């Protein structure tokens, strides 16, 4: 009766970009200047890639205390596992450029404000993630990339190397 019903999981959605498209996304010079929000989103995806495919949730929740010299030690948001990542010079330059200057905020980067309760913080994170993914789709168009681009490309590209 159910012989022709497919019950498996379809896993053919390609999330990794090829090296050429990833290079365009991260560093290509563009025919017109990017809006500031897209520049920040480009910085976030570049950091995620350079920091071994760090998920956006972990990037957003990095604390100032997680950074020691050229090493970031943090707990993975999803699993609680402690991870230590050596920061390449290009990533350190981006961190210094975009580092959170609000002394009241515990966060390393100005993605989350740090002055909200957990429910509001989650909504703030969700908004930041949606904005990042929207900006990345626009950036892909700017760069002439035909594939769907989201915050997952940093992780999946790093895995595919």
Regions found by a protein language model. Give the residues of each.
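Short, basic/aromatic-rich helical patch in the C-terminal catalytic core of site-specific tyrosine
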Residues: 45-48, 52, 59, 151-161
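Short, contiguous acidic/charged loop-to-helix segments that flank catalytic cores in large enzymes
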Residues: 31-35, 73-86, 119-128, 146-153
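Short linear capping/connector segments at secondary-structure termini
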Residues: 2-7, 77, 110-117
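Active-site lining segments that contact anionic ligands and/or coordinate catalytic metals
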Residues: 20-22, 40-46, 69, 80-82, ...
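Short, basic (Lys/Arg/His-rich) helix/loop patches that form interaction surfaces
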Residues: 31-36, 133-161
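Active-site/catalytic core of tyrosine-dependent DNA strand-transfer enzymes
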Residues: 18-23, 88-146
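Basic, Lys/Arg- and aromatic-enriched nucleic-acid-binding interface segment
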Residues: 2-56
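Conserved tyrosine-mediated DNA breakage-rejoining catalytic core shared by Y-recombinases
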Residues: 3-4, 61-97
